[in-house]
């Protein structure tokens, strides 16, 4: 989508990020970032905007994961509630100004409706581009070989992906212990 839009003179697109530089990339620390967001007709985000940024166009939230834990209003979040001023009110006020929420499947819609209730928010279970790409390419042997080579995987062993979810107050007991026996198997 983004490559197409860069070459389409009718769509002016900007990316607020420190990950890349160039004519369409603006650092979040740049003075113009706030104005670009607040004057855009469509804002696509994958997290929360700072409290002082108020977009006036349509806001599309690209949720960043599958909810395998309780979210926002369904979670206790004791650390945030105790240590961040007006945490829930500020976070909720950001959510009620979003128009669309992209999630990975119809099965998770009910969890988002419960955690982030809103009369305005339209939840779209259309998947995540990076996950959809891998699912659609699962039989692509050329891509598979390139990934295996790039990650320097041992092809004589099965692959184990361990990707724990983000938590605000992670402790050592939250992390699955990986034994030498397990590591040697994969």
What are these regions, as identified by a protein language model?
Residues 1-138:
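Active-site and donor-binding regions of nucleotide-sugar-utilizing enzymes
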Residues 1, 5, 115, 125-186:
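Conserved catalytic-core segment of nucleotide-activated headgroup transferases in glycan assembly
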């Amino acid at each position: 989508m983004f490559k197409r839009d860069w070459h389409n003179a009718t769509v002016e697109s900007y990316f607020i990020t420190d990950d890349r530089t160039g004519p369409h990339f603006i650092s979040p620390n740049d003075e113009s970032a706030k104005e670009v967001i607040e004057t855009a007709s469509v804002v696509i985000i994958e997290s929360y905007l700072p409290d002082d940024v108020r977009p006036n166009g349509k806001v599309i939230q690209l949720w960043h994961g599958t909810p395998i834990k309780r979210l926002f209003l369904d979670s206790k979040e004791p650390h945030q509630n105790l240590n961040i001023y007006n945490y829930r009110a500020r976070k909720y006020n950001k959510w009620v100004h979003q128009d669309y929420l992209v999630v990975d499947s119809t099965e998770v819609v009910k969890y988002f409706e419960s955690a982030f209730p809103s009369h305005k928010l339209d939840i779209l279970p259309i998947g995540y581009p990076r996950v959809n790409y891998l699912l659609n390419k699962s039989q692509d042997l050329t891509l598979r070989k390139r990934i295996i080579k790039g990650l320097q995987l041992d092809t004589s062993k099965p692959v184990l992906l361990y990707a724990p979810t983000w938590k605000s107050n992670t402790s050592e007991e939250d992390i699955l212990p990986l034994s030498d026996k397990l590591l040697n198997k994969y």
